[in-house]
């Protein structure tokens, strides 16, 4: 929280609204009453509307109503909301990265490239302490992701994931359902890393 009023989730919400996105689903974690109180009616982000709007989704990973263990399981728990959306493309974003991003050119580039997944990343010089809890991409000259490192013990110039991803809604649904059928729950490890050479990731 910043200044007692703002929270980290305000950044991705503002980015989405400023990018013209009118339908946003927030998958919560445990003890989320304070988040509900903070988001209120969603009027602050102009998301209090009859079509689209802000949807608060419970933190359950499956029919047994247990807390989700990873991004894949969280998305599977929100599958009813996802399938009812009329959006053709989806942006997945964590809420703990402070960024100011216009998503419109990113989505346009994703469509033009024909990628399965477009990952938003930052290239910079990092210490080993900075990078040890991050996902790092190795990319070629055409900015295709060639390999993925998770929580690596490295330092220097790295391209690190900002945990923002663009993909088609159809690809998301197919990927989540396939991963769950195989018992996979980690988007980073089971999708980005394991299928890096199979998928086109930009």
Question: In which residue ranges do the predicted regions lie?
Answer:
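Unchanged
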Residues: 1-202
């Amino acid at each position: 929280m910043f200044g007692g009023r703002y929270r980290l989730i305000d950044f991705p919400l503002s980015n989405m609204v400023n990018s013209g996105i009118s339908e946003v689903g927030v998958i919560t974690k445990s003890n989320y009453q304070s988040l509900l109180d903070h988001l209120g009616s969603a009027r602050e982000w102009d998301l209090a509307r009859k079509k689209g709007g802000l949807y608060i989704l419970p933190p359950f990973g499956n029919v047994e109503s247990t807390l989700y263990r990873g991004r894949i399981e969280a998305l599977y728990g929100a599958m009813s909301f996802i399938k009812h959306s009329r959006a053709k493309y989806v942006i997945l974003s964590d809420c703990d990265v402070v960024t100011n991003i216009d998503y419109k050119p990113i989505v346009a580039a994703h469509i033009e490239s024909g990628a399965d997944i477009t990952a938003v990343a930052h290239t910079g010089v990092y210490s080993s302490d900075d990078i040890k809890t991050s996902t790092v991409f190795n990319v070629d000259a055409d900015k295709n992701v060639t390999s993925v490192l998770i929580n690596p013990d490295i330092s220097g110039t790295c391209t690190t994931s900002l945990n923002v991803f663009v993909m088609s809604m159809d690809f998301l649904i197919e990927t989540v359902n396939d991963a769950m059928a195989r018992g996979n729950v980690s988007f980073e490890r089971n999708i980005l890393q394991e299928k890096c050479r199979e998928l086109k990731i930009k």
